[in-house]
Amino acid sequence: NSAWMKTAGAVIYFVAPVAYQSFSTGSWDGLILFGCLPWMLLFLARASRSSPFGPIGGPTSRFAFEADIFREVLTLGFILGLVFSFSPLVLFAVTLTVVCLCVGSLVAGWKLGFSRLFLILILSYAMAAALNFPWILDYFFSDFSWNTIFHTRSTVAETVDLLGALRLQTELGQNSVFGWGFPALAFVPLMLARGERWAWAVRGCSLYLAGVAAIWVNGMGYLPFVLPRAEVLLVPAALGVAVASAMGVGSLQRDLQTYKFGWRQLIPVTAIIASCLVILPVLGSAFSGDWGIPDDELNDVLFSEEETNQNIRVLWIGDDDLLAASGRQFLDNYTISITSTLESTFIDRWQPPEQPADQFVAEAFDLALKNGTTNLGKLLAPFGITDVVLIEKSAPLPSKGLSVELPEKLKLSLSRQLDLAKIEIAPGINRYRNLSAFGFASSVEGVALIDKQFRTYASGTQPLSVSSLVATGATGTSYQGMIKQNSEVYLAFPFSDHWKAKLNGQTIQPSIALGWGTGYFSEESGLLEVTYETGKKHIYLMSLQCLLWFVAFVGLARSLATARRVQL
C-alpha cells in the first residue's frame, strides 16, 4: 500500500534502457511486451492469491479484489488474446514469468497458489486461442515451426554479451558504469527485506536472472532455434529489477528499523547511488527528445509519392532484425520476405502461411547464385515481383542503426542479371527493378503457363508475348482487359476458385498455372473481367471471431463492474 514502493517500481521500470533500444531499432515486439508485461504480472499475482493480492503467504491488502476465477480468466484471457494478435511472443514472456514466480517462491520458501495460478493460466490461454482461432488455424497449424513464433532470426546481428545483459544494455561495447546500478537494485533488497517483501524480491531477482540467462543461452547456441532480440529478452529482466526495487523501498520503510545498528545501515546509501546511476542516463537522453530513434527511415529513401503504381510487389533480402516484414529463411542466416509496397508498415508483420511460390522463389535465387541464369527477373515475374531490395542497414546514413552485411556472392549474382536494373539508394540499401515484370494479371498469347510447372517455364528460352490487364479497384482484387483468341490469362496469386472470370459475360473455369498460380484459357477474343470473391467459410469464421470478441468484451466489462474489493 506504499506510494513510495509503487513510484520506485514504476520509475526503475521506465528508466530501463530496453524500451528506448526498442524505439531506436524499431522492435515492435519489444515495445509491445514492455507495455503489457507489468499488467500480466499483476494478473498472475492475483491468480496466485499471493500476499498482498490474497491471503497466501501473508496478509491481504485492503486494495485487493475479492477472488473470482471467472473474472480473472476473462481479464487475463482477453488481454492475452489482444496482445497475442500483435505479438505471439507474449505467450513466451508470460510462460517465462510464471516459471520465474514459481522458482522464486520455491527458493524463497514462500507459499504460492500454484494450482489456482495454473488453472487460470490454462483457461486464459484457451480463451486467447479461441479469440484468435481462425488466424491460429491458418498460420500456426498449417505448417508449424519455431520460426512461426521466433521468426527467422540469426545470431549474426546479436549485439549484446553477458555483461551487457546484466546492465540491461543491448549494444555491444556500450561499457557504461551507469548500467551496474540495475543488478545492485535487484540484489540489495535481499539483504533487508522480510516477509512477503522478501518473497517478492526473490521473485523479482528470478525474473531478472531469467532474462539475463536467456541472453547467455542464446549467445552460446545451445538451442535448436534463435531466441528473439536482446531488447525483447530483457523486458522480463527489467520488470524483475523494478519489482525487486519496489520491495527494497518497502524494506527501507519497514524492515531496516528491525535490525540492530550495523552494516545494513549503509544499504540505503548504496540504493541511492544505484538509483542515481540508472536514472542519470535517461535524463541525459531526454534532452534530444528522439530517444535514439534514427533521423532518417527506409521509407524516406525507398518510397516516393510519385510511385503510385499499385501493381507492385517487393522482395526484400536482409537480416531478420533489419526487415520490417516477416519472412522465410534464406541462405541459412538471412531472411527473404515479400510485401505489396516499398513503404514498410505495421501490417507487414502479419505474414501469410507458406505457399508453393516461396519454394519456387528460393529455387530461382539458388539458380542465380550458382550462375545458372542471367535473367532472374524473368523467373521472378510470374510471382508478380517488380522490385528486389537488399537491406544491410536499418536506417540510411548518416543515421545510426543496426548493420548486417549480406554475402558478397549474392550481390555479385544480382549484378550479373541482365533484366534487373540496379538503383543505389544509399550505402547498404540497394534496389533492383525487374525489367521482365508483367504485373499481377496478364494476358499471354498461346499456351505457355497453364498446366505447366515452374521449372519448365524457367528452362524455356522463348520470350512471352504479354500484355497487362487493368486493375479496376484500389484493393487489387479485380482486373479487366481485352484478350485475343486462344490466349491465356495469368494471375500472380495462389490458385483459388474464389477468383471468378467472365469472358463476354460467360463464366470460364480457372486452372493451375506454373504449379501454383491461377490461370484461364480463352478460346475466343473479347472483354475479360476477373474478380476475387471472398469465400463464405472465411466470412463465417471472421464473423464468429468478431462475435467471440464482442461476447468476451461484454463479459469482461460486466465482471469488472461488479468486482468488489476485500473487506478487512
Sequence positions of predicted segments:
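Active-site lining segments that contact anionic ligands and/or coordinate catalytic metals
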Residues: 77-79, 175, 201-204, 231-233, ...
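Short secondary-structure boundary/capping segments
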Residues: 27, 98-101, 142-148, 328-336, ...
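Active-site-proximal, structured, solvent-exposed surfaces of multi-pass membrane proteins
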Residues: 451-568
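Membrane-embedded transmembrane-helix bundle of lipid-linked glycan/lipid transferases
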Residues: 1-291, 295, 300-303, 309, ...
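Short acidic, glycine/proline-enriched helix-loop-strand junctions
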Residues: 395-432
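Short glycine-aromatic motifs
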Residues: 416-421, 435, 444-447, 467
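Extracytoplasmic/lumenal acceptor-recognition loop(s) of multi-pass membrane glycoenzymes
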Residues: 80, 277-281, 305-387, 391-397, ...
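Short, hydrophobic/aromatic-enriched beta-strand segments in well-ordered soluble domains
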Residues: 385-386, 430-437, 527-535
